[in-house]
């Protein structure tokens, strides 16, 4: 089938319409059920990680290999010309784009992925995270997991907990779920790490219900999805981190009274915001969520690199 994502840059979740999201999720489900090990057999994809990553990088590279693509790139920019010789990001991308069919990129600077599109010569750039800004492929696997566990992406009660200021995953996920009808949001965070005002303004403009809370217990009985996040030490000064890191911790005992099919999600890595006794409960779904990253990213790569896709 012809698809609207062919050769498209994927920088922000807002680059994707509701119909685009549904296409990616449907493709992910097909690839999960029916692997396609030669779909990208003659493609070369650059995996360029200017910032540390475990799950996102390995998930993306596994996705590439399982579709038959060749993979080039780096996991540490310190050993590149950009890191050692002071080459600009623009020049780095201009050169890499002459070698490959697509560029997957993570960078600590907000807006770096969007900047890269200006120098990629039309080669698609897929944002694997740019600072505290956007993480669209994490959002796709989150949506895929929510749809699998809840059977829908509409009329959901979704709580987001922890670092909502710097946590790019919650920004992207809120924007994505706002494209679907009837969803309600509960934001649970210390004042220093509250959801940015532009997200709240967006929800208000769309007439979407949201509320602020100071404790997980306030909403446990009402939610379908409890999306936990870690306090990101690397984005805070030491005194601020010490003050807020243990303020919101989920324990197995806290899950009493939760809806039977409520799922706890987390973009990982987990530090101490979810105790290990939660892992043994039927609500814990963060490891399955991480595994779904393979299928969501396979779907996106397949769509971006194939003008027509019949699965």
Curated annotation (Swiss-Prot):
It catalyses: carbamoyl phosphate + L-aspartate = N-carbamoyl-L-aspartate + phosphate + H(+). It is an enzyme of class 2 (transferase). The keyword Protein biosynthesis does not apply. Keywords: Pyrimidine biosynthesis, Transferase. Disulfide bonds: none annotated. L-aspartate binds at residues 85, 168, 230. GO terms for cellular component: cytosol. The keyword Signal does not apply. Carbamoyl phosphate binds at residues 55-56, 106, 135, 138, 268-269. GO terms for molecular function: amino acid binding; aspartate carbamoyltransferase activity. Its EC number is 2.1.3.2. GO terms for biological process: 'de novo' pyrimidine nucleobase biosynthetic process; 'de novo' UMP biosynthetic process; amino acid metabolic process. It comes from the Bacteria. Pathway: Pyrimidine metabolism; UMP biosynthesis via de novo pathway; (S)-dihydroorotate from bicarbonate: step 2/3. Catalyzes the condensation of carbamoyl phosphate and aspartate to form carbamoyl aspartate and inorganic phosphate, the committed step in the de novo pyrimidine nucleotide biosynthesis pathway. Heterododecamer (2C3:3R2) of six catalytic PyrB chains organized as two trimers (C3), and six regulatory PyrI chains organized as three dimers (R2). NCBIfam families: asp_carb_tr, PRK00856.1. Belongs to the aspartate/ornithine carbamoyltransferase superfamily. ATCase family. This is Aspartate carbamoyltransferase catalytic subunit. The lineage of its organism: Bacteria, Pseudomonadati, Pseudomonadota, Gammaproteobacteria, Enterobacterales.
């Amino acid at each position: 089938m012809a698809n609207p994502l062919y050769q498209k840059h994927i920088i922000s979740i807002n680059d994707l319409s509701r119909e685009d999201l549904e296409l990616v999720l449907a493709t992910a489900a097909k690839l999960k059920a029916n692997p396609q090990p030669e779909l990208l057999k003659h493609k070369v994809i650059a995996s360029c990680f200017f910032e540390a990553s475990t799950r996102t990088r390995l998930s993306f590279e596994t996705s590439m290999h399982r579709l038959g693509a060749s993979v080039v790139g780096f996991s540490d920019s310190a050993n590149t010309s950009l890191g050692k010789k002071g080459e600009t990001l623009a020049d780095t991308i201009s050169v890499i784009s002459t070698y490959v069919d697509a560029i997957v990129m993570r960078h600590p600077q907000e807006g770096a992925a969007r900047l890269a599109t200006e120098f990629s010569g039309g080669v698609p750039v897929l944002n694997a995270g740019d600072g505290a800004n956007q993480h669209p492929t994490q959002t796709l696997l989150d949506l895929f997991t929510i749809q699998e566990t809840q059977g829908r992406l509409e009329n959901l009660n979704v709580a987001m907990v922890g670092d909502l200021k710097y946590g790019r995953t919650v920004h992207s996920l809120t924007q994505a779920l706002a494209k679907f009808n009837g969803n309600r949001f509960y934001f649970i965070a210390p004042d220093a790490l509250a959801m940015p005002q532009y997200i709240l303004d967006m929800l208000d403009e769309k007439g979407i219900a949201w509320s602020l809370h100071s404790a997980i217990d306030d909403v446990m009985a009402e939610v379908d999805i409890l999306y936990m996040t870690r306090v990101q030490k690397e984005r805070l000064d030491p005194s601020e981190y010490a003050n807020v890191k243990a303020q919101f911790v989920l324990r197995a005992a806290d899950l009493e009274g939760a809806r039977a099919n409520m799922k706890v999600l987390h973009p990982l890595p987990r530090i101490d915001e979810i105790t290990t006794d939660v892992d043994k409960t039927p609500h814990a779904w963060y490891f399955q969520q991480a595994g779904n990253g393979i299928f969501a990213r396979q779907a996106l790569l397949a769509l971006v690199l194939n003008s027509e896709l019949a699965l």
